[in-house]
Amino acid sequence: MEKISRTKIVDLMKREDFGAMVNVKGWVRTRRGSKQVNFIALNDGSTINNVQVVVDLANFDEEMLKQITTGACLSVNGVLTESVGAGQKAEVQAREIEVLGTCDNTYPLQKKGHSMEFLREIAHLRPRTNTFGAVFRIRHNMAIAIHKFFHEKGFFYFHTPIITASDCEGAGQMFQVTTMNLYDLKKDANGSIVYDDDFFGKQASLTVSGQLEGELAATALGAIYTFGPTFRAENSNTPRHLAEFWMIEPEVAFNEIQENMDLAEEFIKYCVRWALDNCADDVKFLNDMFDKGLIERLEGVLKEDFVRLPYTEGIKILEEAVAKGHKFEFPVYWGVDLASEHERYLVEDHFKRPVILTDYPKEIKAFYMKQNEDGKTVRAMDVLFPKIGEIIGGSERESDYNKLMTRIEEMHIPMKDMWWYLDTRKFGTCPHSGFGLGFERLLLFVTGMSNIRDVIPFPRTPRNADF
């Protein structure tokens, strides 16, 4: 086979030098035709679009042609030709074909449609489908957008540890990390495990958040962001929860709650605009195939300012809805941690646009959030989105050493684990704020997928760690 430099299909579709010899490589999506001519839809993953390879059967070995089945991998040399078919600009008239990899007839991704549940069971193959090819290209582009946004605003990308001895959220739902023999654990007189001989000499876990370390960096570098995997040992089998997911967490010195809300709104709008501008084909495919209102919803986020509403006012709106006959599964009262149905009512039914809810009761929020003067609420903020509910959670951080100490004691957090965090309040404390965006929740919104397990390549959930 003549050696010709490969052209990606995404680039091939932009070329207009018809008559040129080209090489394309990819996997067969479909093959159809007559006894004289076959049409092969070839895809290499660079785009949602296939290139049509036109094969004059008389010019090729019959035994080789038998190997060209759905899923087979081909290298094709041919003439780039202007297509007469609708929906495609160019096609390739095959001159040489090499089968790089045959595909066994047990290949599960045949031309028929497959359920999302079935595709989760073959997560090692599902990126080859149109749907997951689109989702994972969008995932890549969203990661690029995140780095680009913060770089352009002068933030520093800061790497925080995955193994930690602190629990940022105080929930205790952490995966432990140990090298100890689980069948011969050393225990003290009270029956508690002794970690002195463990690898780190203390109890260690996988991180639930890089926020605390991010705060340390912000008080030195001014503005930082983290972007990495986080882990929650929360036994939740829902379409919104994963045990392993990715978080983006900016922290900014001297920002108070208003600047924090401004940053969150600007950031998420930037990401949505990036998806519409740079993933147009993939977004359109998902809009047409899965969620007819996807593009309209994405564009709607960009058109108006987000509503900014105190938690107390949000509760009043929900209580009024109940009084008028609206049924919620979970009760509404001041002090409740809002359920997704409450959040979505505010966004989808009442305001019909994203909402930033602020000033939550301190009893339902984390220890590090700055307390308001009323003594009952903290300067927390949650960004609520249609179809998703909470997509961002953040706050102005408590900068007062004594107030932070008191809150840590109230929540029974071991002081020995927090000395380094408290040091930042002893040595040149400053106002600072930040938030966390669950990457997969952003992807749920941008792709229109309904289950968070379908926007991450290999989902980790209770009793599921395959691949």
Curated annotation (Swiss-Prot):
Superkingdom of source: Bacteria
Keyword annotations of the record: Aminoacyl-tRNA synthetase, ATP-binding, Cytoplasm, Ligase, Nucleotide-binding, Protein biosynthesis
Signal peptide: none
Its EC number(s): 6.1.1.22
A molecular function GO annotation: ATP binding
Record SUPFAM superfamilies: Class II aaRS and biotin synthetases (SSF55681), Nucleic acid-binding proteins (SSF50249)
Stated family: Belongs to the class-II aminoacyl-tRNA synthetase family.
Protein name: Asparagine--tRNA ligase
Organism encoding this protein: Bacteroides fragilis (strain ATCC 25285 / DSM 2151 / CCUG 4856 / JCM 11019 / LMG 10263 / NCTC 9343 / Onslow / VPI 2553 / EN-2)
GN (gene name): asnS
